[in-house]
A protein has these predicted regions:
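Non-heme Fe(II) oxygenase metal-center motifs and adjacent flexible, charged/small-residue loops
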Residues: 1-181
Length: 181
């Protein structure tokens, strides 16, 4: 008897170094986090609203310097930072956080996060709605689309961090298996 016969591989299994944790935070934690985020100042420098904590990333220069220090990471983010340290490959508390707001129809071009700017593990927490993110590896000409359920967290390290671009297509709705989500 094969116990694994009915277990289908998940799309993220195709990408070494990508870990997806569904329901990383509770609905209550999400609600409190959104309320705190919405009470902070948003920047409108890009086609989307953004908040920077710790250090401000310079999108034009693709860099961060000590001059871009914008203060400490707020207390409302501390519980998530501490969980990252306990439950992931992070070896120290994050010192930089970027909050991106993507409205329907907005997205972000496919990219690899700036290598000298950010450390070996990147984490992303999805809030408010499900979203499809596309991963592309130009070295092997492969594309993998993954559903990020709201309140899920994904980590990129190793091959996923350095060889796979990730982006969100600018579309009003996402489809999974022909169904609009």
């Amino acid at each position: 008897m094969n116990l694994f016969a009915e277990i289908e591989p998940k799309p993220q299994d195709a990408i070494s170094g990508l870990t997806l944790i569904e329901s990383f935070i509770s609905e209550d934690e999400e609600s409190k986090l959104i309320k705190n985020i919405d009470n902070q100042l948003w920047l409108n420098d890009l086609k989307r609203r953004v908040q920077h904590y710790g250090y401000k990333y310079d999108y034009k220069a693709r860099g961060i310097t000590e001059d871009f220090k914008v203060g400490d990471i707020p207390q409302f983010i501390t519980p998530i930072s501490e969980r990252l340290l306990r439950e992931s490959s992070f070896t120290k508390l994050p010192d930089q956080v970027i909050v991106n707001e993507y409205l329907p129809g907005q997205g972000i071009s496919s990219h690899i996060d700036c290598v000298p700017c950010f450390e070996e593990t990147i984490a992303s927490l999805s809030l408010c709605s499900d979203c499809v993110i596309d991963f592309t590896n130009p070295y092997i000409n492969q594309k993998v689309s993954i559903l990020l359920p709201k309140r899920s967290l994904f980590f990129l390290k190793g091959e996923a961090r350095y060889n796979w671009q990730h982006g969100i297509a600018s579309r009003k709705t996402d489809k999974i298996d022909g169904q609009i989500i």
